[in-house]
Design a protein with these regions (language model features):
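Bilayer-spanning, highly hydrophobic alpha-helical transmembrane segments
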Residues: 185-209, 231-247
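Transmembrane alpha-helical segments and their cytosolic interface motifs
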Residues: 7-17, 77-81, 174-203
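Channel- or pocket-lining gating/hinge segments that regulate access to a cavity or pore
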Residues: 165, 169, 218-277
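Membrane-spanning helices that line or support transport/gating and their immediate boundary helices
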Residues: 29, 33, 93-104, 208-211, ...
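Large intracellular
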Residues: 1-9, 13, 25-172, 276-277
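Lipid-exposed faces of alpha-helical membrane segments in multi-pass integral membrane proteins
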Residues: 14, 18, 81-94, 196-199, ...
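Juxtamembrane "helix exit" motif at the C-terminal ends of alpha-helical transmembrane segments
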Residues: 19-37, 95-96, 196-216
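Membrane-interfacial helix-loop-helix connectors in multipass membrane proteins
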Residues: 60-63, 209-228
């Protein structure tokens, strides 16, 4: 089990580094150059008093339509950090999802081979456990083989079907707690993404307040850009958080189903066939 935790920690660090490098590369080569080019474009047409004369133009000379470009929305550092955290969280969710898929494939295997009319006696528990003990260590540490061994060992030691069923229930509950603990870093990112967006909100409001003096003289471009930082950071953070939370809840649902199906597997194929005499 320690090797599993070490592998998860290594994957988490590697995923964070790769996410940061990938997002930074995209920002440096695509998003910020495109945003700078859009903001540098002169107004396509002068402000017109007619309603259908063309796009509204800010005092900085950039059409308002261009300010709604996705490249302009994503260009600031808060959005970059939010996207790095979101991609990292999705990598962690994907890793945990692959572990769930590996465990689910084991439900198709027949670890306890019982012929028609055969039962499992306490003295036979050790013999039925030997095929599981001969499995590779990684497979032995997965939920289904581990819970089967717990059931067989408890049945052989106590000669009680009820104690064996209780041991399986406790093992499944421990697995749920372990899976929940593994998602702590994903929950951290789900909290950190809106926090980063709030930092952008505060920065944008501060920038807008600094330009308030210019607005008194009729130049609202600075206030507009400051409020744009606020809205863009908030929008990016909220959308990223929604995506992360959606996949997080999908993963939790898959984990809960896995544990429930494993418990039903053991009850149907082992517990029901246990006999004390």
């Amino acid at each position: 089990m320690r090797s599993v935790f070490g592998r998860e920690a290594l994957f988490s660090v590697a995923a964070l580094l790769i996410s940061a490098i990938l997002i930074q590369t995209i920002y440096a080569t695509v998003i910020r150059p495109r945003a700078a080019a859009i903001l540098a474009e002169p107004a396509a047409a002068a402000p017109s008093e007619a309603p259908n004369a063309g796009p509204t133009v800010t005092h900085a000379g950039t059409p308002t339509r261009n300010l709604r470009s996705v490249f302009v929305i994503l260009k600031d550092y808060e959005q970059e950090v939010a996207l790095i955290l979101a991609l990292w969280a999705l990598c962690l969710i994907g890793y945990q999802g692959s572990e769930v898929a590996r465990n689910r494939r084991l439900l198709d295997k027949d670890y306890i081979e019982l012929g028609e009319g055969r039962v499992v006696l306490p003295d036979d528990a050790r013999a039925y456990g030997r095929p599981i003990e001969s499995l590779p260590r990684d497979e032995q540490e997965m939920l289904l083989p581990r819970a089967l061994m717990v059931a067989l060992n408890r049945f052989g030691a106590t000669r009680s079907v009820q104690d064996s069923a209780e041991a399986v229930r406790a093992e499944c509950e421990n697995e749920l707690d372990r899976l929940d603990a593994q998602l702590s870093m994903v929950r951290f990112t789900a909290w950190a993404i809106p926090a980063v967006g709030f930092v952008g909100t505060v920065r944008g409001i501060g920038r807008a307040l600094q330009e308030a003096q210019g607005a008194l003289h009729g130049d609202i471009s600075g206030v507009t850009l400051g409020l744009g930082v606020t809205f863009n950071a908030t929008l990016t953070a909220l959308v990223s958080c929604i995506v992360v939370m959606f996949f997080l809840h999908q993963l939790q649902q898959a984990q809960d189903r896995l544990v429930l199906d494993a418990r039903m597997y053991i009850d149907r194929r082992l517990i029901r066939n246990m006999r004390v005499h």
